[in-house]
Design a protein with these regions (language model features):
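Long, low-complexity segments enriched in small/aliphatic residues
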Residues: 1-54
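Long, contiguous, secondary-structure-rich segments that constitute the structural scaffold
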Residues: 48-65, 69-132
Length: 132
């Protein structure tokens, strides 16, 4: 394939998957944005399907998972409503303090519906990881 495609200088087609850092990807932790954010599949949804069912939301809330060490250094307690920002957006989400996440990383379930006033502050109240 790499012999038949017209590639720009420096472009490569690899025979197996190779990690490529995104423009806000791995290695972009800064003083302003000191934590990595990863998405994971939520137990009450299939991607965004079933994300609108109140009974499922009641038993499996949309929560940001954070390591106890990171939570303590930021005065975050389990159940707190917190603001999370990135260079491209902001969400508000409930915190779940758990040792199941490594320090320096937060985890947000994928599939939450975007709930923001796009004519106002544009802050997503639904905890949609794609906002970040």
């Amino acid at each position: 394939m790499s012999r038949t495609w017209d590639l720009e200088e420096g472009e490569v087609i690899y025979p197996i998957p190779v990690f490529q850092a995104g423009f806000h990807g791995y290695g972009s932790v800064t003083e302003e944005f000191p934590l990595y954010c990863c998405g994971f599949h939520h137990k009450s949804r299939t991607h965004s399907s079933f994300g609108f069912i109140p009974e499922l939301e009641a038993v499996a809330r949309q929560q940001l998972w954070v390591n106890p060490a990171d939570a303590e250094s930021r005065s975050i307690e389990d159940g707190d409503l917190i603001a999370v920002t990135s260079p491209v957006g902001e969400i508000r989400i409930e915190a779940k303090v758990t040792p199941r996440v490594i320090p320096g990383t937060v985890m947000i379930p994928q599939g939450a519906w975007h709930k923001a006033n796009m004519n106002g502050d544009k802050v997503d109240e639904g905890g949609c990881v794609n906002t970040l």
